[in-house]
Amino acid sequence: MIKYTDFFELIDNGGNLPIAALFMTYGFDAELFEHHILPSFIGILDDPRENELRFRNQIALKLKEIPIGVISDSKQFNGGRTFLYDHITVQNETFHPKCYMLLFKEYLRVIISSGNITKSGLCYNAELVWYEDIYLDKSNSISNELQFILSFIEERYSLDNMPALKMIRKYLNKCEFNEAYPKIISTCSNKNVFNKVISELKNCRGNCKTITIISPFFENDREKEIESTLLMSFLNEVKNIYPKAKINICFPANKQGDKYIVNAPFGIFNEVTKKYKDISLFVVPREWEREDDDPISRTLHAKLIYAQFDNGYNLYLSGSINFTNNAMTSSISNLRNIEIGVLNYTKQKLILPNFIKVSLSNLEFVEKEETIKQLTCFINKAEYNGKDLKILFNSNKMVVPCKIYYNENLLLSIDNQIEEKIIKNFILKKPQDLKVECNDFIFYVPILIPNKEDIITDDLKLNFELDMKDIIDYLSGKYKSISELERMKRIVSNEKQDRNNEMLIFFRQNLQRFYKALLAL
């Protein structure tokens, strides 16, 4: 079984001074990020449900000091951003890593996971999480590859104006690198993950007894350059190195009657079990255990290749990499997915989930129906300079007619293909994204703000200094909560009402509230 780990404990600054953070994720839930991850990292203790205005004011002030960057896949973004932090969405390839880098004053925390920044990834799925803290006065084995990945991403996606990325790269430049395990591997290199894993298996000491492959997704597409499925190709390589190694293939399933319903392609398993008799199939049910041993239903989303050797060592690969062609065979020359994983060779054993051994006759393959049409994100950039909003379109991909909304209001209605549109005197409100509606699909585009330090949002205009009148009003029951009081103060401030005139107008009412408040004390 995989023990339950609270991801949010790794994000919490624990009293350490936060400097910058970069979050690279496939799916991105802005509400989850802004209400839980962001405040945990920058050190905001207020609950937005109890005091939303103060919560937003504190985060807005912190973001003036601490640069935050998010990179996610464009097709998986559903809008919802409300704070000034950098967010870039990737369109050219599938951006699939789950790598989170948190820079504190004393160290850099690197988290490599199978879980996205979504409610499913951080709260409900069964995921694997690996992390390491890098200190400047200690050598490490991962800083060089991380530096290479960030350099590649910065150049490929033109991230020259992302301060969080630059600050983390600057820190990595100071680190002392040592060639050892664990190693970071990615698809941002000339050698793909498939070949890297095979090379590592060849170079390990001892004989491999067992290899366990856990993946929520498998592919059975036969590409022209591959004579068999990816899984068969991998097993052929493994058996060539370690002929006696046993292979365990594990995948999620739901039990219905005497059958296990799976979405892993049936043909793959039929092919490999016919050729190799020492291959075992296992299903991972949706029943997991937490540390308190209370059963909890979780969907398997972890990815793992786990090789056990007769010398007591174990080689494992975890991270974002599914056992699919797009993930395992991508490289710079054939880049379909951006993936990041960690490869470790250690005597430490992993605690695996409860497996149920099955035969092919126990399985029933159900292919998921694609009900949603493929998105085409045709806006390259939406950039706000403090006065105007410039929208750049990819005319080759553009779908018309389309409508662009901001803050639930129609901003543009476009009937013909264009390359650029400038919205003069654009007023930035609370939402930080554009919503694009076409006939068949909807997508969201984050608004980029290069000069964030010059932008004063409503969250920064709030003043929470309460005077005697405010206290009297609150105690007398004029306001249901402190949040309502602060909201009214903001309205008064925005309307620039004169304080002296206001006190004259409401003198009698305030006097009545004063006596009422005395009775309440």
Q: What is the meaning of each model-derived region?
A:
Residues M1-L317, T324-L521:
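Terminal interaction modules at protein C-ends
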